[in-house]
């Protein structure tokens, strides 16, 4: 695939994080990419906040039933693919990822168009409870994998090549 065929969009799965997303969205939009927010079964109040974020380059897709982040991402991936996008940059709605890293992720994705690109979060701004929850998750993932050096088992900023990702998703 040449750079001329490379088309990326940002997908943000959102459940119970509409307020932090509203604060982070201007930083995310600074990347210059369009944004698809996947409303993953939010309350009416949270959905109203998401609706207030609509703009020419921001859309909200409703994913009913709140089946979880993975299903919300697949829903968003399939929509993006149907719109001709080749890559999706996924960033979590909770504001823990550095949106200013999106251009760097984009450059890497353009160089390595068939590879999944994962960022590393900055844990300095994370509340203690969330830090501990991540640490416990990392610990058990390391135990399961037999490895101790896991930087982020729950990476919230990635770039997916859509065709390959959807092919794997449809096999399972």
State what each model feature region is:
Residues 9-13, 62:
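Short hydrophobic beta-strand elements that form part
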Residues 16-30:
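Short, well-formed alpha-helical segments that are part of the catalytic scaffolds
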Residues 39-48, 95:
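A conserved acidic beta->alpha catalytic loop
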Residues 17-20, 42, 69:
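Donor nucleotide-sugar binding loop of glycosyltransferases
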Residues 25, 33-42, 61-63:
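Short beta-strand/loop segment that forms part of the nucleotide-sugar
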Residues 64-79, 99-172:
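Acceptor/aglycone-binding surface of glycosyltransferases and processive sugar-polymer synthases
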Residues 85-96:
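Short beta-strand-to-loop acidic/aromatic patch adjacent to the donor-nucleotide binding site
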Residues 7-9, 34:
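Cell-envelope/extracellular polymer assembly enzymes that use nucleotide-activated donors
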